[in-house]
């Protein structure tokens, strides 16, 4: 499965559009609290624990989106957008969306 943020895949014409696909992952309050509790992990202004949790949430959102596209018969997703939203106190949502296509 090819996944790209661009609207086209150079050298590979889009033969069919299937529509919007998306995936979400929500990090619960305990995860966020645990991340900030491990503030000693911060080196050079970056928190390895926080980045790891964000990467895992992003991976889950992309996997959900990819699986939805596969079920539609797509072999690529174009125009992918990743969003990070704080929802409620201490909860973070990562969402991925794009257009499922056949190339």
From Swiss-Prot:
Signal peptide start-end: none
Residue runs in coiled coils: none
Intrachain disulfide bonds: none
Alphabetized SUPFAM superfamilies for the sequence: YbjQ-like
Protein family: Belongs to the UPF0145 family.
Xref: HAMAP family: UPF0145
Family matches, as PANTHER family: UPF0145 PROTEIN YBJQ
Protein name per the record: UPF0145 protein Dred_2155
Organism: Desulforamulus reducens (strain ATCC BAA-1160 / DSM 100696 / MI-1)
